[in-house]
């Protein structure tokens, strides 16, 4: 695991714990199947997956085999699980679906597959974030384009008001920022850290936002006033 991935994991865990939205874990995935998913061993999975009950079981982290298969380099793993009855919309203990993970990990073909199999493009996790909101922080433009084409709500925010545009501005990606604006992002929506303009330290992104009517919030939070620090680490207190 890279340092950036570890940081993301710790940030997500801390935020979810503070939000109090964890759920109790249920089920228990068969060890043979679980090992096959980890190895990307399609043959072993085909042999040991008896049907939907195993395909939709959960491990100790509350994740389904399909959720874990999103990380496999072999798309055949996810295809087999779906063919065996895996639920494309099954949530883990944080309310995240396989599409949330595929979107924020920039797995374009997995996103395409999940959408084709009925994944809810506007599913909300326990913090209210949709796959598009997650993707805007980490994924490449083609993933966002695919989600929007499938009906993702560009303007929506999570439970704290944070939208895809907030994440794109924080990330400092001009192409993603312009794409979201062109598809109806709300320029001055306020989240706990202010408006999208409050969250960028990049003059180019700031110019793009101002040119179409973006502005800083009138009453900016402590976090938004120190957003340069926020770019690298979410504060654990509000």
Residue ranges, per PLM feature:
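Bacterial N-terminal signal peptides that target proteins for export
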Residues: 1-10
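Ankyrin-repeat-protein effector appendages
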Residues: 21-32, 150, 183, 191-192, ...
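N-terminal segments that cap or nucleate solenoid repeat domains
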Residues: 25-68
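Start-of-repeat signature of ankyrin repeats
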Residues: 29, 62, 95, 128, ...
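Ankyrin repeat A-helix N-terminal signature
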Residues: 35-40, 68-74, 101-107, 134-140, ...
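Ankyrin repeat structural motif
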Residues: 41-49, 74-82, 107-115, 140-148, ...
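Ankyrin repeat boundary/linker residues
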Residues: 59, 92, 125, 158, ...
């Amino acid at each position: 695991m890279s340092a950036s991935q570890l940081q993301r994991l710790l940030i997500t865990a801390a935020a979810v714990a503070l939000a109090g939205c964890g759920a109790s874990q249920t089920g228990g995935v068969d060890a043979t199947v679980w090992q096959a998913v980890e190895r990307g061993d399609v043959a072993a999975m085909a042999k040991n997956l008896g049907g939907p009950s195993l395909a939709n079981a959960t491990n100790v982290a509350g994740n389904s085999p399909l959720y874990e298969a999103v990380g496999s380099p072999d798309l055949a793993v996810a295809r087999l699980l779906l063919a065996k009855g895996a639920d494309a919309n099954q949530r883990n203990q944080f309310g995240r679906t396989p599409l949330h993970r595929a979107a924020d990990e920039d797995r374009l073909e997995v996103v395409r597959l999940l959408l084709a199999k009925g994944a809810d493009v506007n599913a909300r996790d326990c913090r209210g974030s949709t796959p598009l909101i997650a993707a805007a922080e980490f994924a490449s433009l083609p993933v966002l384009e695919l989600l929007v084409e499938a009906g993702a709500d560009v303007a929506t925010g999570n439970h704290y008001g944070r939208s895809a545009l907030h994440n794109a501005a924080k990330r400092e990606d001009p192409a993603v920022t312009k794409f979201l604006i062109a598809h109806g992002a709300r320029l001055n929506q306020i989240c706990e850290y202010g408006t999208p303009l409050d969250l960028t330290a990049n003059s180019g992104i700031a110019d793009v936002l101002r040119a179409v009517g973006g502005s800083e919030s009138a009453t900016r939070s402590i976090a938004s006033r120190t957003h340069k620090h926020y770019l690298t680490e979410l504060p654990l207190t509000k």
